[in-house]
């Protein structure tokens, strides 16, 4: 229950579909990025800037972002808390 999450430059993703947000510096993640590119499952949302985070979706799509993983994680948590607040309001009315 995360809704849409801003990953930079006006790009948003469906938060419920993301299974991991990782730092792109390790060799295995670089290979994962190359494999996704070959399979047509790479989504580059960096606008030509340095990749600072790799997001992995439940459909094995790899999304590149120029935003730090910590910042994206904070946005996930903020979205979660906002949805929880809305649900609390609905529960209190009902």
UniProtKB/Swiss-Prot annotation:
Domain of life of the organism encoding this protein: Bacteria
Pfam family, one: RemA-like
InterPro entries: RemA-like
Family affiliation: Belongs to the RemA family.
Record HAMAP family: RemA (MF_01503)
Name of the molecule in the record: Putative regulatory protein THA_332
Source organism of this protein record: Thermosipho africanus (strain TCF52B)
Lineage: Bacteria, Thermotogati, Thermotogota, Thermotogae, Thermotogales
